[in-house]
């Protein structure tokens, strides 16, 4: 117990993130919507080269192991994806910006998944430069998506073919190329509620498709029954198209629905979720401190007490001079 040598454990940045800055603002500045890893599909952007800082395989421990439960994951046949976003090099939606052929974004991660598990899952597909699950640096709350940067484009392409669509702890993973950030793809993801509980992908496309090119759409479904929950995410190719859809459909009852839709940016929905989560943990914004009283206040109180004693008339029965 006492007297034993205790190893000094210092903080190590996550895999490949020597220059990682613990800043909440860094998260909110990213063009994808925060933090809705439970539902939202983040495919809009990834951290730039200065944030990724790849070090190569020399700086990593191999967590996969021969006996890992995920050791043969890349030999599994992926389920057929129902997502409209192609996982090819176009980055989805015909965006003119080039994509990084080695950097992937992984969506719909289990809430309790760790960096080690994610690394073991993708390491079987090839050497990895960087691998990180995006989390709130204060609470550790997982946003449900991650970036994985492979050493070669062939390994990244293999990871998309083999891991995309598989189920991990009741979560169906979505793996695709991460698109570089830019002003043209910010604020393009919409969060839609009050949809009919019988809505299909084609009906969702019919409602929103008239306002622009839909890059991706995802109807959230009940885990047990598989029926729609009345909630969906719709990502447009341009910000202007998303804003037009908000103006045209928010608080409007579409054909076949019984209540008006709520359409807003997914980023706003993510911030509301994060604020609610922080309040549940008792980590909301601190109350404003009570200002300390200055010396002038103390002097005023002291003078008031002196004047009160000076003008106070003592009752005759309580006057000690009467009994002398």
Swiss-Prot record:
The keyword Cytoplasm does not apply. One of its GO terms (molecular function) is mRNA binding. It is found in: Nucleus. Pfam families: RRM_1. Residues 102-180, 188-268 form the RRM domain. GO terms for cellular component: nucleus; ribonucleoprotein complex. Keywords: Nucleus, Repeat, RNA-binding. Expressed in somatic cells of both sexes throughout development, but not in the pole cells which are the progenitors of the germline. CDD domains: RRM2_Hu_like (cd12376). GO terms for biological process: alternative mRNA splicing, via spliceosome; sex determination. Unknown; apparently not involved in somatic sex determination. NCBIfam families: sex-lethal (TIGR01659). This is Sex-lethal homolog. It comes from Musca domestica (House fly). The gene is SXL.
